[in-house]
């Protein structure tokens, strides 16, 4: 889908004059930061569009948008345009940052005056091709440039500065398409729609135009018909944000609320709510107890807090023993019911203490003596050193044996320990045992000289 401009509008010089004045107002806007190098305002001398621009509509969204809004994506092409700008610059670079520079860093020169140079910049053969997003509403048209391809020829009256200015202009050209041109097109469209039936020959001055931009009526910002275009989901989110200023929502205090909003508790009334909470400290702090007589009183005792968040008995109550177990049980039960209101199966964990009969002093003394005796008995057993030599019993050998060879291990098993072992006598499975060597002098005792099959190993 394509779009054609009216050739008669571009053929008339009035269009170029309007663009020139609008561009001069945008470049000299007071909202922009004025460069110190510029000694005067920027004046647009000439604007010319010999070739009619081309506009191609790539996408148009009208159905999904409200009736007062239209969105589209367009491609703009412009060729052979010309722009001439004139201004005055400061050539003495020492005076540019004179206000922000300390005096002791400035050199004392013989002639340190201002030296201004008038400069004229001409942009010719401008070729522009850009993809834009267009938003059309009743007051005007808004355009944002996304993809811009720009080429031009630059000519400066001061040739020594031409290369530097051209490089800086190309680097900062994105500011022109991001801020200057969109504001220029929007202001022009506003003036065009408001004065559609009237002549546009009279153009307001600089101050009047700036006042027209800054002063806006309240109906333009938010009209009554705009509420129908707002999404109900967004309205619900906005209402939740507004209601979030009241925090700490307590559903259990809807009837007896401490604030104007039912079900909510404001932070400035939080101490009042805590003071009404059932606790041991809040209950006993309301009663008056005699203060201890002491010469030195600390600052913490002089200043008594209005409430306490801990469920503890005050020290004065414990010292004076003016507490009641039934009252403490009632308060603790109320706290438990309040904390477990949603859980019916929860049971309180109570600490049970069994009280027995008091012991007589004689029983205590006898038990103490018995404990002492037990401790001494234990000490006598444990105090035996480990390295104490244990006397070994002599072996009871027959009197007719003179030379014996012991085959027992060097570790002697005590009789007490050996009795605990499960030693069952089984004579049928016992293997024959033989002594090796000369063990007897009398052959009548049936002692053998060794193994029957092999002689003893004599060396």
Swiss-Prot record:
Main localization of the protein described in the UniProt heading: mitochondrion
Domain SMP-LTD, first and last residues per copy: 1-190
Membrane-topology annotation of the record: Multi-pass membrane protein
Statement: the UniProt record of this protein carries the keyword Aminoacyl-tRNA synthetase: no
Region (Disordered): 338-375
Family annotation (CDD domains): SMP_Mdm34 (cd21673)
GO cellular component terms, A-Z: ERMES complex
Subcellular location, record wording: Mitochondrion outer membrane
Basic residues: compositionally biased ranges: 348-359
Keyword match Mitochondrion: yes
UniProt feature, compositional bias: Basic and acidic residues: 338-347
Post-translational modification: Ubiquitinated by a SCF (SKP1-CUL1-F-box protein) E3 ubiquitin-protein ligase complex containing the F-box protein MDM30. Ubiquitination is important for mitochondrial integrity.
Molecular function terms from GO: lipid binding
Domain of life per record: Eukaryota
Keywords: Lipid transport, Lipid-binding, Membrane, Mitochondrion, Mitochondrion outer membrane, Transmembrane, Transmembrane beta strand, Transport, Ubl conjugation
An annotated GO BP: mitochondrial genome maintenance
Family to which this protein belongs: Belongs to the MDM34 family.
UniProt free text on domains: Lacks alpha-helical transmembrane segments, suggesting that it resides in the membrane via beta-sheet conformations similar to those predicted for other outer membrane proteins and porin.
HAMAP family: Mdm34
Record function comment: Component of the ERMES/MDM complex, which serves as a molecular tether to connect the endoplasmic reticulum (ER) and mitochondria. Components of this complex are involved in the control of mitochondrial shape and protein biogenesis, and function in nonvesicular lipid trafficking between the ER and mitochondria. MDM34 is required for the interaction of the ER-resident membrane protein MMM1 and the outer mitochondrial membrane-resident beta-barrel protein MDM10.
Subunit-level organization: Component of the ER-mitochondria encounter structure (ERMES) or MDM complex, composed of MMM1, MDM10, MDM12 and MDM34.
Protein name: Mitochondrial distribution and morphology protein 34
Protein's organism: Saccharomyces cerevisiae (strain AWRI1631)
């Amino acid at each position: 889908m394509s779009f054609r401009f009216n050739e008669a509008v571009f053929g008339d010089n009035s269009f170029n004059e309007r663009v020139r004045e609008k561009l001069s107002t945008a470049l000299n806007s007071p909202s922009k930061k004025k460069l110190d190098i510029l000694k005067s305002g920027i004046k647009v001398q000439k604007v010319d569009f010999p070739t009619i621009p081309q506009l191609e509509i790539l996408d148009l969204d009208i159905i999904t948008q409200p009736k007062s809004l239209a969105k589209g994506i367009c491609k703009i092409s412009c060729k052979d345009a010309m722009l001439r700008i004139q201004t005055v610059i400061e050539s003495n670079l020492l005076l540019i940052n004179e206000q922000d520079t300390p005096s002791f860093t400035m050199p004392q020169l013989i002639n340190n005056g201002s030296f201004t140079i008038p400069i004229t910049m001409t942009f010719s053969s401008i070729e522009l091709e850009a993809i834009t997003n267009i938003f059309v509403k009743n007051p005007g048209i808004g355009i944002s440039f996304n993809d811009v391809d720009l080429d031009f020829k630059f000519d400066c009256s001061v040739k020594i500065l031409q290369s530097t200015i051209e490089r800086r202009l190309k680097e900062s050209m994105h500011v022109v398409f991001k801020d200057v041109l969109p504001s220029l097109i929007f202001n022009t469209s506003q003036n065009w729609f408001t004065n559609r039936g009237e002549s546009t020959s009279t153009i307001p001055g600089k101050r009047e135009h700036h006042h027209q931009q800054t002063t806006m009526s309240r109906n333009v910002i938010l009209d009554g018909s705009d509420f129908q275009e707002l999404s109900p989901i967004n309205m619900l989110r906005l209402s939740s944000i507004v209601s979030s200023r009241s925090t700490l929502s307590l559903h259990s205090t809807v009837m007896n609320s401490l604030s104007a909003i039912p079900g909510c508790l404001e932070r400035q009334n939080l101490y009042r709510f805590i003071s009404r909470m059932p606790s041991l400290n809040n209950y006993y702090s309301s009663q008056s107890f005699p203060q201890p007589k002491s010469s030195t009183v600390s600052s913490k005792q002089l200043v008594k807090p209005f409430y306490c968040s801990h469920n503890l008995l005050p020290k004065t109550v414990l010292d004076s023993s003016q507490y009641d177990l039934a009252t403490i049980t009632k308060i603790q039960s109320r706290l438990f019911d309040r904390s477990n209101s949603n859980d019916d199966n929860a049971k309180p964990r109570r600490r049970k203490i069994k009280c027995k009969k008091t012991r007589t002093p004689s029983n205590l003394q006898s038990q103490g003596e018995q404990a002492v005796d037990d401790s001494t008995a234990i000490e006598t057993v444990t105090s035996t050193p480990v390295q104490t030599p244990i006397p070994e019993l002599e072996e009871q050998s027959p009197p007719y044996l003179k030379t014996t060879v012991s085959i027992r291990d060097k570790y002697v098993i005590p009789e007490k320990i050996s009795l605990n072992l499960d030693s069952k006598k089984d004579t049928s499975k016992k293997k024959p045992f033989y002594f090796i060597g000369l063990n007897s002098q009398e052959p009548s005792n049936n002692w053998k000289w060794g193994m029957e099959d092999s002689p003893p190993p004599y060396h």
